[in-house]
């Protein structure tokens, strides 16, 4: 569920880093061998580049989505999901060296395996009453319905902007469309 996805990801990340560094914390005062147990099956959580960032970092933080329910859609054929994160827990003076928006994409059984979709992540720049928000495209990916696993989007610049200007933190929007532009509900 929503409230345990970030902690489970952090546990998996810890286990991935511990295994990579030589088997975990057994050499750190534990008298028993450490066996990593991962909560998700799938591709590695940390890429080689992520591992370099993590090795140099003195802190890793995870944030859960604060949006409980998506707003009613103004345009009945435009579907999206909203995500908001409270970055006020980042200690003052700390530099954010990397920030990622990670979502897990399930296998879409209701579609043909080779059907392709475009997944786009937008920064919400301004919200309006009675019409769509102003958005800035951060990244998009084209995926098959049969693909499954973590999707990682780099939002370092956006999160740094939000840390410096918290009132501009209006969140992210995720949109899914077919390649011919038909909006799909990203449930």
Swiss-Prot record:
Which GO terms of the molecular function aspect are on file?
cytokine activity; growth factor activity
Glycan-linked positions: 114
Might you name a Gene Ontology BP term for this protein? positive regulation of brown fat cell differentiation
One Pfam family assigned to this protein is TGFb_propeptide
Q: Which InterPro entries match?
A: TGF-b_propeptide, TGF-beta-rel
Instruction: State the disulfide connectivity.
Output: none
Q: Which UniProt keywords apply?
A: Chondrogenesis, Cytokine, Developmental protein, Differentiation, Disulfide bond, Glycoprotein, Growth factor, Osteogenesis, Secreted
Record's Gene Ontology CC terms? extracellular space
Which cellular compartments is it found in?
Secreted
Q: Tell me where it mainly resides.
A: secreted
Q: How does it assemble?
A: Homodimer; disulfide-linked. Interacts with SOSTDC1. Interacts with TWSG1. Interacts with FBN1 (via N-terminal domain) and FBN2. Interacts with type I receptor ACVR1. Interacts with type II receptor ACVR2A. Interacts with NOG; this interaction inhibits canonical BMP signaling. Interacts with SCUBE3. Interacts with ERFE; the interaction inhibits BMP-induced transcription of HAMP.
Summarize the protein's role: Growth factor of the TGF-beta superfamily that plays important role in various biological processes, including embryogenesis, hematopoiesis, neurogenesis and skeletal morphogenesis. Initiates the canonical BMP signaling cascade by associating with type I receptor ACVR1 and type II receptor ACVR2A. Once all three components are bound together in a complex at the cell surface, ACVR2A phosphorylates and activates ACVR1. In turn, ACVR1 propagates signal by phosphorylating SMAD1/5/8 that travel to the nucleus and act as activators and repressors of transcription of target genes.
Q: Which family does it belong to?
A: Belongs to the TGF-beta family.
The protein's name in its UniProt record: Bone morphogenetic protein 7
């Amino acid at each position: 569920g929503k409230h345990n996805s970030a902690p489970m990801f952090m546990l998996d990340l810890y286990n991935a880093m511990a295994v990579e560094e030589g088997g975990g914390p057994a050499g750190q005062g534990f008298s028993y061998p450490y066996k990593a147990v991962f909560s998700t099956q799938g591709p590695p959580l940390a890429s080689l580049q992520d591992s370099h960032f993590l090795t140099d970092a003195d802190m890793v933080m995870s944030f859960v989505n604060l949006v409980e329910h998506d707003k009613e859609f103004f345009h009945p054929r435009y579907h999206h999901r909203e995500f908001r994160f409270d970055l006020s827990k980042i200690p003052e003076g700390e530099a954010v060296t990397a920030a990622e928006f990670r979502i897990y994409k399930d296998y879409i059984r209701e579609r043909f395996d080779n059907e392709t979709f475009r997944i786009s992540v937008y920064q919400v720049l301004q919200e309006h009453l009675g019409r769509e928000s102003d958005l800035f495209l951060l990244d998009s990916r084209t995926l098959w319905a049969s693909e499954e696993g973590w999707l990682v989007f780099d939002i370092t610049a956006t999160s740094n902007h939000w840390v410096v200007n918290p009132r501009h933190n209006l969140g992210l929007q995720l949109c899914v469309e077919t390649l011919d532009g038909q909006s799909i509900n990203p449930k």
